[in-house]
């Protein structure tokens, strides 16, 4: 990440965002120089206007007019060029800063675990990455120099006006305290309103995103009017929040505009009187009137700038909350070295056990400690595929009183197949999520190759334990690109096609007009459920995992295709450990161990033959699926 979000969580929003701006500070220095040039010209041009009136129009020195006008034109050109330059540099400054901020947000999202995404709406996350970051960009790129411009112009104009005529300037200055009181009131009331607008916009985005994703369900149930009504409610809430902000501005802006008009009235009235009395020249009055916009402009603009500043603060609060979110699944420090050491110990114990079992007495390994240390450092982290659940119980962190899994205890040797059956909600998907460490067990240990899953580096564990989830997701890419997503960078087309063949997808892919170059939507639009499942399986196989978890992966596939896939999986090299969750007996009957789950507990375990012979829950499921009556033989 570009900036550590936990460095100073109590810092103000402006101080918090500065580290993202730091690499572009030289650009800000350049913009500041152009800003000074622009404002110097802006403060000088009105003085020249007064000189022209006094020297040329009143004094009759017409020969000075070309020189003074030429000087004004030159200053105007310099001012326009300088203003364009610093505006472009500040825009680049804001864009670069937000680029780094969005990158950190996106990286943070990848660090967060399933618990966060289970309880955070997609629209809220999208608002953090889009509208909230744009509010920060707007503040850095535009509001920052507008505030500086207003302050410099206001103070600079007052100073010059005091130098021209202190009496008129003093009267104008007496109006400014009322301006600051009004702007303070506007700011105080605007802050909670902007925060409410941000929340309402996030809710609206979530609702729209949910409907776009579920548009097929909406159409299938003819719920368009209902969803439109829901959208209108969210949209109306967003409108009302914005109207509340508009009412707040309307309450203060007329007073601010009125004070701005009073400045012009005082200048013309009192200034005209002073000219008539001879206390100031007509040229000075013209200069005063030209400076007036530098007083009036900041007064009128202050209300809008305060609104933008409060929008910036509300957005910062939202983004900081995301960046400081703490993931529950955290990799231990020095996990790589710790696992290498643990692997060496496990291998040594196995070696000693084998030696003792063969001779009846311990046998020296013949390898020194230094040699073992060297081997450990050079040993690549590879998972063989042993899985052990040691009295594991689990409850979701936000509901610890409701256990999902209860005292699970079983072992799956490397290269074998585990089948899991159970009713919907029995905890099957949660069980396999513990293997990839998407969650940590509440009680007990999940051991991979004899090492606690919490000790493995997350990248190693998840790269070699691959889940083909129930909810198939395909990226907006070609079919080949979707399958290759799970493969290493050096995989070629032949490898991708081989994985598709194993998953039973090659034939239907080749039947498409563009074959593997066919582009599919993010949800696999245009593909059947079975085709999407087979592509997801091919993507997982392309990752060449040591442990392959199939979460009801072939539920939408016909029996013949499923049998072909099972055959190909058995023939694969490498001896993968396969964990198959299914509702169909045919998907798990060839497993070395079958678990039957009910309400988070293992109620039966064994091979297919053992469970059928036991005449228990598995036997009931088996006979119902085969369409048999209890005790009636049908040749199976």
For each feature predicted by the language model, list its residue ranges:
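Membrane-integrated ABC transporters
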Residues: 1-42, 57-69, 86-90, 94, ...
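Short intracellular "coupling" helices and adjacent cytoplasmic loop segments at the cytosolic face
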Residues: 2-7, 59, 95, 103-127, ...
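Alpha-helical segments in transporter systems
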Residues: 15, 26-47, 51, 68, ...
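An intracellular "coupling" helix at the cytosolic face of ABC transporter transmembrane type-1 domains
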Residues: 18, 23, 114-115, 131-140, ...
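Transmembrane helices of ABC transporter permease
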Residues: 23, 27-38, 71, 75, ...
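Helix-loop-helix
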Residues: 61-67, 160-177, 244-323, 349, ...
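ABC-type nucleotide-binding domain
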Residues: 339-636
């Amino acid at each position: 990440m570009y900036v550590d979000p936990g460095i100073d969580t109590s810092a103000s929003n402006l101080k918090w965002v500065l580290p993202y701006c730091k690499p572009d500070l030289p650009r800000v220095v350049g913009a500041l120089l152009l800003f000074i040039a622009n404002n110097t010209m802006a403060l000088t041009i009105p003085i020249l206007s007064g000189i022209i009136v006094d020297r040329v129009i009143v004094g009759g020195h017409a020969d000075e007019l070309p020189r003074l006008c030429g000087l004004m034109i030159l200053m105007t050109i310099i001012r326009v060029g300088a203003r364009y330059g610093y505006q472009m540099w500040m825009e680049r400054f804001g864009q670069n800063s937000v680029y780094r901020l969005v990158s950190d947000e996106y990286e943070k999202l990848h660090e967060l675990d399933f618990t966060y995404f289970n309880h955070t709406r997609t629209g809220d996350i999208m608002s953090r990455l889009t509208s909230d970051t744009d509010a920060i960009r707007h503040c850095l790129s535009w509001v920052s120099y507008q505030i500086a411009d207003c302050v410099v112009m206001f103070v600079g104009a007052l100073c010059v006006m005091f130098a021209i005529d202190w009496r008129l300037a003093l009267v104008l200055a007496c109006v400014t305290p009322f301006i600051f009181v009004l702007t303070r009131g506007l700011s105080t009331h605007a802050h909670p309103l902007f925060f409410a607008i941000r929340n309402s916009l996030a809710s609206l985005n979530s609702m729209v995103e949910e409907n776009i994703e579920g548009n097929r369900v909406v159409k299938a149930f003819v719920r368009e009017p209902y969803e439109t009504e829901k959208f209108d409610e969210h949209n109306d809430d967003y409108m009302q929040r914005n109207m509340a902000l508009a009412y707040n501005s309307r309450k203060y802006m007329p007073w601010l505009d009125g004070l701005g008009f009073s400045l012009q009235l005082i200048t013309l009235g009192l200034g005209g009187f002073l000219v008539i009395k001879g206390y100031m020249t007509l040229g000075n009055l013209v200069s005063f009137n030209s400076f007036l916009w530098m007083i009036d402009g900041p007064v009128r603009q202050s209300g809008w700038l305060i609104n933008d500043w409060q929008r910036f603060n509300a957005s910062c609060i939202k983004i900081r909350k995301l960046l400081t979110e703490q993931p529950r699944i955290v990799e231990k420090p020095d996990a790589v070295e710790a696992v290498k050491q643990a692997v060496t110990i496990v291998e040594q114990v196995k070696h000693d056990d084998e030696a003792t079992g063969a001779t009846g007495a311990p046998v020296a390994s013949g390898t020194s400690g230094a040699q073992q240390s060297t081997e450990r450092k050079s040993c690549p982290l590879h998972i063989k595929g042993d899985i052990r659940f040691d009295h594991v119980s689990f409850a979701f962190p936000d509901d610890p009183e409701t256990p999902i899994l209860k005292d699970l205890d079983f072992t799956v040797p490397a290269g074998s197949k585990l089948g899991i059956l159970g009713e919907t909600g029995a905890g099957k998907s949660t069980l396999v999520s513990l293997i990839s460490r998407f969650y940590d067990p509440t009680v007990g240990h999940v051991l991979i190759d004899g090492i606690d899953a919490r000790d493995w580096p997350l990248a190693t564990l998840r790269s070699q334990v691959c889940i083909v989830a129930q909810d198939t997701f395909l990226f907006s890419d070609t079919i080949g690109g979707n399958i290759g997503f799970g493969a290493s960078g050096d995989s070629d087309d032949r490898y991708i096609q081989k994985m598709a063949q194993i998953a039973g997808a090659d034939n239907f892919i080749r039947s498409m007009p563009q074959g593997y170059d066919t582009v599919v939507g993010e949800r696999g639009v245009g593909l059947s459920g079975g085709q999407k499942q087979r592509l997801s399986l091919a993507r997982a196989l392309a990752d060449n995992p040591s442990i392959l978890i199939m979460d009801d992966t072939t539920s939408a596939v016909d029996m013949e295709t499923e049998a072909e896939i099972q055959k190909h999986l058995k023939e694969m090299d490498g001896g993968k450990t396969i964990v198959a969750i299914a509702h169909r007996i045919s998907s798990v009957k060839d497993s070395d161990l079958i678990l039957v789950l009910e309400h988070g507990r293992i109620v039966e375990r064994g091979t297919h033959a053992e469970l059928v012979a036991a005449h228990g829950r598995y036997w009931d499921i088996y006979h119902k699926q085969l369409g048999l009556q209890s005790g009636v033989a049908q040749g199976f």
